[in-house]
Amino acid sequence: MRTLIFGKGYLGTSFAASPLFRGSLLSGVDITDKAKVREEIQRYRPQVVINCAGKTNLEWCRDNKMEALEVNVAGPLFILHVCAELDLPMVHMSSGCIYEGKGAGGRGFSEKDTPDPKCFYSKSKALADELLTQAQYSKLLILRLRQPFSGASNPRNLITKVLSYQKLITSPNSMTYVPDLISATAFLLKDNQRGIFNVCNEGFISPYEIAVIAKKLFKLSQKYTPISKGELDILNAKNNREHRVDTLLNIKKLLATGFKMAKVKKRVKDALKTLSRSLP
């Protein structure tokens, strides 16, 4: 499938490197420039367009609100407009960070739950989802992922981030193994699925649990201190950092399509083993 991928960051490069999207074009054009978006799509003539572009740094979004809205909201709408004109399927990478908590009965938030964003980044992602959905384009697929990780040595990789901290929260979270996200995207496109899907691995895990597994696997001397979410909130407020959310997402809708999603703890171990091969 000839695919045009917007965004040369962690997700975009991961998609482009996958055999499932072999031959795709990875574009770094400014998605806030509608003319450039149209030119890129018309030049490459893809069969599907995937938007992985976006601003994800919470503090940057808070301090640069207009720019954050341009990239996280206006940009995806420009891509949608051109895709609709050319009758092309569009996949938009969204975020589960538009929720906080465990959802009804502790089973995680479903795609139908009303977003309750707690920081400006989350607000921009929730707004984009709302406006994209209200456009009622029949070939739109929105995927909500959460704390993406893999075996890649990349500063955006959740595992890389976790291992760089000394204090880590013990509360469980939903997380997304990037190779599984890519597989799910290919599956959903082939199955002609549309609408919003939560795409996370089965089960939940805390950042502290990841560090404990890594410490044992790598025989690390680094000490990791477990802290509560409340303690993290106090530290972030003290250091003028944006609010971080704990979020559980429900993936029943995804599983109902027939896609098989691996357990998150297994994928964390898989990612750590892959990452260990790149260590000196």
Segments from the language model and where they lie:
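N-terminal Rossmann NAD(P)H-binding glycine-rich loop of SDR-like oxidoreductase domains
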Residues: 1-19
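Active-site loop of classical SDR/Rossmann-like NAD(P)-dependent oxidoreductases
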Residues: 10, 29, 207, 227-253, ...
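NAD(P)H-binding glycine-rich loop region in Rossmannoid oxidoreductase-like domains
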Residues: 31-71
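NAD(P)-cofactor binding segment of oxidoreductase domains
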Residues: 63-91
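Catalytic helix-loop patch of NAD(P)-dependent Rossmann-fold dehydrogenases
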Residues: 70, 75, 98-143, 150
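NAD(P)-dependent short-chain dehydrogenase/reductase
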Residues: 130-183
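Mid/C-terminal beta-alpha module of Rossmann-like enzyme folds, strongest
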Residues: 191-239, 276-280
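Amphipathic terminal alpha-helices
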Residues: 262-280
